[in-house]
Amino acid sequence: GHQKVLTQAKRKAKKDKLPFGVITFEPVPVMFFNSKLKNHRINSLIKKKKQLQRLKIDFLVIIKFDKDFSLITAENFIKKIIFNKLRSKYLFVSKNFRFGRRRIGNIKTLKKNEKFFNYRTIITPPYKKDTKTISSTLIRKRLSSGKIKEANQLLTRSWCVIGKVLKGKQRGRKIGFPTCNLSLDSYIVPRLGVYSVNISAN
């Protein structure tokens, strides 16, 4: 779903000779509001940056999502970020986009403020595959249930995690081949099982 939004935005920016940029939040808002939600990420911020670089974006705005920012109203978000900071001409969003304090802002809010702040809202329809709407929620379900191949098909790439190798109980010495304990940090944790993976190390 996100990829479709980005693709359409890039095409429009190129056509109108405008800079193409992306706004993202760190940490993920849902994780900020739910401290018990430890494993939710599909991507790390590092991985997200690399993917956006491949799309050749002109700029990336990373907004620190903290208590102060969570209190900003939808109207102030439009005024301070969309208008004052970015001077956006087009906003590409999915139909279920929510923003602002208590997630009150939606498509209607964006549309209502278009003329005053001189921008246009473009709503990207849901991307479907085999009658199923492709979304982050669906991808998380596939990953957490261990259906990595299906998740990769939805992502159109191989799922990747980045983490530190932790010292374990050194059981690899007893089973005849080396092992490593990888910290998944805030990533989705796949179902317990055996998986074939490719590894690169720094």
Residue ranges and their predicted role:
Residues 1-39, 44:
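N-terminal catalytic cores of NTP/NDP-binding nucleotidyl/phosphoryl-transfer enzymes
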Residues 6-10, 49, 78-79, 107:
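Generic structural signal for well-ordered alpha-helices
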Residues 23-27, 55, 59-68, 125:
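A conserved beta-strand->alpha-helix junction
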Residues 39-48, 72-78:
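Glycine-rich, highly charged phosphate/nucleotide-binding loops
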Residues 44-46, 51-58:
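ATP-dependent adenylation/nucleotidyltransferase module used to activate substrates
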Residues 62, 68, 75-79, 83-202:
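Active-site cores that bind ATP or allylic diphosphates and position pyrophosphate for catalysis
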